[in-house]
Amino acid sequence: MTVTAAMVKELREKTGAGMMDCKKALAETNGDMEAAIDWLRAKGIAKADKKSGRTAAEGLIGIASAGAKAVVVEINSETDFVARNDAFQELVRGVANVALGTDGSVAAVSKATYPATGKSVEDTIKDAIATIGENMTLRRSAMLEVEDGVVATYVHNAAGEGIGKLGVLVALKSSGDKEALNAIGRQVAMHVAATNPLAVRSSEIDPAVAERERNVFIEQSRASGKPDNIIEKMVDGRMRKFFEEVALLSQAFVMNPDQTVEAAIKEAEKSVGAPIEVAGIARLLLGEGVEKEESDFAAEVAAAAKG
């Protein structure tokens, strides 16, 4: 497969590696971008936290809650200008509130009735596109609910009540004091916003993700030239560290790095007055995994001048 300049550029942006290293990585992996990232990591040239690449979609994240149930939605727009528009912000809040009455899936939210218009959310967004003059889409949504407990929420970079660039839900099961439970839940939600854990517990991490990390660690360890039995111990140690870093409960608590999140929750049980279980987390970062289409600015100006 021919390695193009655009492919090299994309890999450089995702990894921070040099141009020649990126070109070699793509050649070695037959142009497979993810495999090329792993190749660079195995050589110690790229770090895992660079893999996600750039995010560039505009819009807002909206959150709505009702104690033991909460939802988070992402509505994208083409420009940040529209995201600052009062009508758009009200639309995001409204869709989040409508989502509370559904199972939280995009399909269910889209079909639900939007009270202010009497139409479906999908048709209401279409009407908003015509009114505001810019394309919009309900891209993602998530819902968490517990029978006895709270779903704490947190919005980072808030643009107003319940809307912002990053939204987090943390579901806590407990029969204890709900106000105290929500307080620790909000702290954990802020932690999730900052650290982006892959799962609540290490046992819940996608086996494919864990296997991929193990393979990278094996290649890195082999470069040391040590015997296989030593390499196996090195890899096991790195995997333990990996799980500690990406599983919520084993992470160092942002509010107090001297204790884990699990220890902080255990400590909070004293004020809550009952055991606490983390039932789930949801984290939506605006535009995550979306890249704006690159454009030629000079060509845009020329086209505008002709128009």
Swiss-Prot record:
Transmembrane feature ranges: none
Keywords: Cytoplasm, Elongation factor, Protein biosynthesis
CDD domains xref list: UBA_EF-Ts
UniProt keyword annotation of Secreted present: no
Molecular function GO terms recorded: translation elongation factor activity
GO cellular component, one term: cytoplasm
PROSITE patterns xrefs: EF_TS_1 (PS01126), EF_TS_2 (PS01127)
Pfam families reported for this sequence: EF_TS
Disulphide-bridged cysteine pairs: none
SUPFAM superfamilies given in the database record: Elongation factor Ts (EF-Ts), dimerisation domain, UBA-like
Protein's UniProt keywords contain Cytoplasm: yes
Alphabetical list of Gene3D superfamilies matching this protein: 1.10.286.20, DNA helicase RuvA subunit, C-terminal domain (1.10.8.10), Elongation factor Ts, dimerisation domain (3.30.479.20)
Main location: cytoplasm
Cellular compartments annotated: Cytoplasm
Region of interest (Involved in Mg(2+) ion dislocation from EF-Tu), ranges: 79-82
Listed NCBIfam families: tsf (TIGR00116)
Function: Associates with the EF-Tu.GDP complex and induces the exchange of GDP to GTP. It remains bound to the aminoacyl-tRNA.EF-Tu.GTP complex up to the GTP hydrolysis stage on the ribosome.
Alphabetized HAMAP family for the sequence: EF_Ts
Similarity comment text for this entry: Belongs to the EF-Ts family.
Record protein name field: Elongation factor Ts
